[in-house]
């Protein structure tokens, strides 16, 4: 199953338009959720290992909101429990990836409808999961994490177009707005959540 998921990830990242036009819509809900869980676990295991190796883990070096939250709360959990912040970083990353999934699906479903989209909740699930592939698969890579977050933004455009039928211009404008908010958030909070490796 892991090799199949890695093959899917490669197709999403290398052939995003072809994938979103065809294969993405044909995937069942269980398959999409399993893919998301496997890649989330992959991210949750590798993120703290890279931190232990001495690379920074702060909000600027996070590809996902789950990593940002984990970096913020892991030191606090370490103080409360005595368990290493690196263990907490992994656990919290995975937990927050799972918690955020239905929230992001609901958020993007509502906004897709407001933009004139015609997809159902399954399309919104695929809209969250498949464009998130670069951040989930590669978001642990030192000093390039933010780049993978931007890659996710790039993949949202064809996903909005092909999974919800949203016009290209609206899809680009919406994604640009969301990425602008994310960049502003990073700029405003970037120095405050540093975890020393």
Language-model features and meaning:
Residues 2-115:
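Selected alpha-helical membrane-embedding segments in polytopic membrane proteins
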Residues 46-55, 143, 184-193:
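C-terminal TM-helix exit segments that contain a strictly Trp-centered aromatic cap at the helix terminus
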Residues 53, 72-79, 163-171, 193-197:
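Short, highly charged low-complexity linear segments
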Residues 53-62, 149-152, 191-197:
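Functional transmembrane-helix hotspots
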